[in-house]
Swiss-Prot record:
Protein name according to UniProt: Large ribosomal subunit protein uL22
Cellular component, GO annotation: cytosolic large ribosomal subunit
Quaternary organization: Part of the 50S ribosomal subunit.
GO MF, one example: structural constituent of ribosome
PANTHER family found in the cross-reference section: CHLOROPLAST 50S RIBOSOMAL PROTEIN L22-RELATED (PTHR13501), LARGE RIBOSOMAL SUBUNIT PROTEIN UL22M (PTHR13501:SF8)
Record flagged with keyword Endoplasmic reticulum: no
CDD domains (UniProt xref): Ribosomal_L22 (cd00336)
Region (Disordered): 120-167
Organism per entry: Koribacter versatilis (strain Ellin345)
Record-stated family: Belongs to the universal ribosomal protein uL22 family.
Function comment: This protein binds specifically to 23S rRNA; its binding is stimulated by other ribosomal proteins, e.g. L4, L17, and L20. It is important during the early stages of 50S assembly. It makes multiple contacts with different domains of the 23S rRNA in the assembled 50S subunit and ribosome. The globular domain of the protein is located near the polypeptide exit tunnel on the outside of the subunit, while an extended beta-hairpin is found that lines the wall of the exit tunnel in the center of the 70S ribosome.
Length: 167
């Protein structure tokens, strides 16, 4: 099941918002929040609030519907920034003229989903590493293939140049 949160009419261009959204796409929610805390882009705090809101939505809906949801297994499934309406503005120009420009607005949407078969902690334990170490020692180490002798290059011929007849 997907849990979404939307922020409409955010005063940032969609291109700038996508830079930050691409950082968190596919990450666990906890990792995404940590990434957003240390991102120096201006839109990062707004996206942080949005991910947190989506996580709260997931918690609320799972309690309402009686779902067994583990918040540690949530990950960012979809993070998109769409264009909103553009605000037309005028910048004064020399000689009484005016130049028009557009302030871009974006609609940001984040969807969280639960990863099936995903363990909450990514750290490996000592018990998990013990069988791996035994298997590595028991296998014979493969030798690297012998290097071929490098072929010697013939020295390059010198260019004699174009000879012209003297008059």
């Amino acid at each position: 099941m997907e849990f979404t949160a939307k922020a409409n009419f955010v005063r940032v261009s969609p291109q700038k918002a996508r830079l930050v959204l691409d950082l968190i796409k596919g990450q666990r929610v906890e990792d995404a929040l940590n990434t957003l805390l240390f991102t120096k882009k201006g839109i990062a705090p707004a996206i942080y609030k949005l991910v947190h809101s989506a996580m709260d939505n997931a918690n609320y809906l799972s309690n309402e519907k009686g779902l067994d949801l583990d918040l540690d297994r949530l990950y960012v499934k979809k993070a998109i920034a769409n264009d909103g309406p553009r605000m037309k503005r005028i910048r004064p120009a020399p000689m009484g003229r005016a130049f028009r420009y557009q302030r871009r607005i974006s609609h940001i949407e984040i969807s969280l989903a639960e990863k099936p078969g995903f363990q909450g902690s990514t750290a490996t334990t000592v018990e998990d590493e013990a069988p791996k170490a035994k298997g590595a020692k028991g296998a014979k180490a493969k030798k690297a293939p012998a290097k071929k002798a490098a072929a010697k290059k013939a020295p390059a011929k010198k260019f004699a140049g174009k000879k012209t007849a003297k008059r």
